[in-house]
Amino acid sequence: MGENIAKNKKAYFDYFLEEKFEAGLVLKGSEIKAIRAGRVNLKDSFIRFVQGEAFLFNAHIGRLETTHHFYAHEERGSRKLLLHKKQIQKMIKAVEKDGYTVVPLQLYFNDRNIVKIQIAIAKGKQLHDKRNDLKEKDMKRDMERSMKDY
């Protein structure tokens, strides 16, 4: 993985991540420019399957002031994901199970400077699971603090 552009931190907190995939995105030139400028947010975004194809919904890619309105893009529009058919079929089967979904994790430039998105098959966490994660995180932080003193 190359340079990280945006990360969906909420997905790491709300879901158990099972299997990760790398996907390409179908984007316009104005969207690429906005992504390079860092005007992207994956919070509240999700992935749906429409007629055997994967789409990213509700991902915010802001407009640049320098882009002419004729070439401008939708800020929260749907964007097609580029995946192999076997990967899409695997994800569709996983989503059909109860409690499973596909979530976007992070947007980044790969080694060839192409925008990629990392997505994962995920299972939703219960409230007690989230509490346990927070407790473990606090304990780990306290341990590191105490180790730092010695």
UniProtKB/Swiss-Prot annotation:
Its main location: cytoplasm. InterPro entries: SmpB, SsrA-bd_prot, SsrA-bd_prot_CS. CDD domains: SmpB (cd09294). One of its GO terms (biological process) is trans-translation. Transmembrane segments: none annotated. One of its GO terms (cellular component) is cytosol. Keywords: Cytoplasm, RNA-binding. GO terms for molecular function: RNA binding. It is found in: Cytoplasm. Belongs to the SmpB family. HAMAP family: SmpB. Required for rescue of stalled ribosomes mediated by trans-translation. Binds to transfer-messenger RNA (tmRNA), required for stable association of tmRNA with ribosomes. tmRNA and SmpB together mimic tRNA shape, replacing the anticodon stem-loop with SmpB. tmRNA is encoded by the ssrA gene; the 2 termini fold to resemble tRNA(Ala) and it encodes a 'tag peptide', a short internal open reading frame. During trans-translation Ala-aminoacylated tmRNA acts like a tRNA, entering the A-site of stalled ribosomes, displacing the stalled mRNA. This is SsrA-binding protein. It comes from Sulfurimonas denitrificans (strain ATCC 33889 / DSM 1251) (Thiomicrospira denitrificans (strain ATCC 33889 / DSM 1251)).
